A protein has these predicted regions:
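Polyanion-binding surface elements
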Residues: 1-20
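Short helix-start
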Residues: 7-8, 30-56
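Class I SAM-dependent methyltransferase "Motif I" SAM/SAH-binding loop
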Residues: 74-76
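Conserved SAM-binding loop of SAM-dependent methyltransferases across substrates and taxa
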Residues: 78-88
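Conserved SAM-binding motif I beta-strand of class I
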Residues: 92-96
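Short alpha-helix immediately C-terminal to the canonical SAM-binding loop
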Residues: 99-103
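Conserved SAM-binding strand-loop segment of SAM-dependent methyltransferases
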Residues: 111-118
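Class I S-adenosyl-L-methionine
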Residues: 122-132, 142-329
Length: 345
């Protein structure tokens, strides 16, 4: 619609979240904002109101500097890895190509170590030294939604740019961690992982893959593969290394580990505490636009929902055969967050 922006476009323009834009619209704080076919539209020349929930002060930002070890953070996104490893690893350099994710990252954390730009333009010789190098490289070409084009395709193939940067560093990190979807191990009879494993071995690292699903920690399913590599000149403590497969290894990892040179069977204690239930952690007073939500629900799913007196179901969009579709779960587990174009978020 000429002269108007969507909620998402307005959020990107103002550097806030789409949810914040929706709240401002519902509170009538954006002059000229209106609903057309149950969807908010905002005048392109509308002034940005003051947003009380913006993160813009040093007092609200997370300080990641107090940690005994340092890390590089490739494909950093909004900084979930940095947050997860806080207290143990402090990022000295982080990178992503997405401007909106960069805005969120910088709003969340103190210190200016984030470099916005294409990894193809990164030169390893310019990076500070670090103990750990983390790369959550793109998953699209290793997932079903991306038709499993493979590790040499355009998106997932950016892992080779990561290794090129690693080759250029003046001092290689002693530990590498690469994260991706289960297709890294499963697709193409494991050839994707075999190529990556060989590349890491050529660079002087012993490595192994583990498979974790977040549902053992919380009520959300997010199956992921973590490839952990340690340089050959580092002595690996026996406490974290097994002699055979364990609960961290799915069938694909077991099959690969039994045939590959330099494979490490990583070991860790298995969580024994049951995760919190979905119902116990839901925010019952969350602000949302009921019309916008119901607009996404097809009639066949509404019929199923209406068959319950009261139900908590999680829904997310997935791309199958090139088309978006809504999927619901009724088992108390949330599925992976999904991007509209496919792949996990």
């Amino acid at each position: 619609m000429q002269g108007y922006l969507s909620v998402q476009e307005t959020a990107a323009k103002w550097g806030i979240t789409p949810r914040q834009v929706q709240i401002l619209c519902k509170e009538n704080r954006i002059v000229g904002a209106s609903k057309i076919s149950k969807v908010w539209v905002i005048p392109s020349d509308a002034d940005k109101p003051t947003v009380s929930c913006e993160v813009d002060s040093a007092e609200t930002k997370v300080d990641l500097s107090h940690a005994p070890y340092t890390m590089h953070e490739f494909f950093a996104g909004s900084g979930l890895v940095a947050y997860g490893l806080k207290g143990m690893f402090s990022p000295v350099w982080s990178n992503d190509i997405n401007e909106r994710k960069a805005t969120v990252y910088r709003a969340n954390f103190l210190h200016d170590h984030f470099v916005l730009g294409d990894i193809k333009d990164v030169r390893g010789s310019e990076l500070p030294t670090a103990h750990l190098s983390w790369a959550s490289f793109p998953c699209q070409d290793l997932s079903l939604a991306g038709n499993m084009k493979g590790i040499f395709a355009d998106r997932s193939g950016l892992v080779w740019e990561y290794l090129r940067v690693l080759d250029e560093t003046l001092e290689k990190p002693k530990i590498l961690a690469l994260e991706n979807v289960s297709g890294l191990l499963v697709a193409n009879n494991g050839e994707n992982y075999k190529n990556l494993h060989e590349a890491l071995r050529q660079r002087g690292y012993r490595c192994g893959a583990i498979f974790l699903n977040s549902e053992i920690f919380l009520p959300q399913s997010r199956p992921r593969v973590f490839v952990i590599a340690v340089h050959d000149d580092v002595i690996i403590p026996e406490e974290i290394m097994d002699k055979e497969p364990n609960w961290l290894h799915n069938k694909a990892a077991v099959a690969l580990g039994k045939t590959l040179d330099g494979w490490v069977w990583w070991k860790a204690p298995k969580p024994v505490k049951a995760p919190a239930t979905l119902e116990s952690i839901l925010d019952q007073n969350a602000v949302f636009d009921k019309d916008d939500v119901l607009r996404l629900v097809p009639q066949r799913i509404m019929d199923e929902l209406n068959s319950y007196e009261s139900v908590i179901a999680t829904g997310y969009r997935r791309t199958r055969n090139g088309h978006q579709q809504l999927e619901l779960r009724f088992d108390g587990i949330a599925g992976c967050l999904r991007t509209p174009a496919g792949g996990s978020s």
